[in-house]
Amino acid sequence: MEREGVDYHYVNREAIWKGIAAGNFLEHTEFLGNIYGTSKTAVNTAAINNRICVMDLNIDGVRSFKNTYLMPYSVYIRPTSLKMVETKLRCRNTEANDEIHRRVILAKTDMDEANEAGLFDTIIIEDDVNLAYSKLIQILQDRIRMYFNTN
């Protein structure tokens, strides 16, 4: 469940489009009828406070973010199959069948596009969620160590 002020900061469509037009976002994308974006202010505030941002972006968001002044390190967590994606969605029991079908089609597109050269620095195969999580944590710890050893 997404929570205001924790997972996202919700604004109405007009406000986000004004912010996008004003250049206040590093990236933005529309996904399943919702507009998502990463504000420059949020990322800059994190940097000033010596924090590292970990973001959950779709493929278009990653492409946009790669073209910013930042040096993002991108990790794609690849499902082993579309059946795995469908099973996870069904287990959540939050979407209707047509929505699940739409999300599986989007996952197929993402899986195909994730192979684009230079888009992802690392790809983790999610054959076991706990192992994939451990790999992600190790990558984050390595990147944090590298960052603080060079700055």
From Swiss-Prot:
Key words, A-Z: Kinase, Transferase
Kindly provide the name given to this protein in its UniProt entry: Guanylate kinase homolog
What InterPro entries does the annotation carry?
GK/Ca_channel_bsu (IPR008145), Guanylate_kin-like_dom (IPR008144), P-loop_NTPase (IPR027417)
Sorted alphabetically, which Pfam families does this protein's record hold? Guanylate_kin (PF00625)
Mind telling me which SMART domains this protein's record contains?
GuKc (SM00072)
Domain named Guanylate kinase-like is located at 1-141
Taxonomy, superkingdom: Viruses
- The species is Vaccinia virus (strain Copenhagen) (VACV)
Family recorded in the similarity comment = Belongs to the guanylate kinase family.
Q: Molecular function terms in GO for this entry? A: guanylate kinase activity
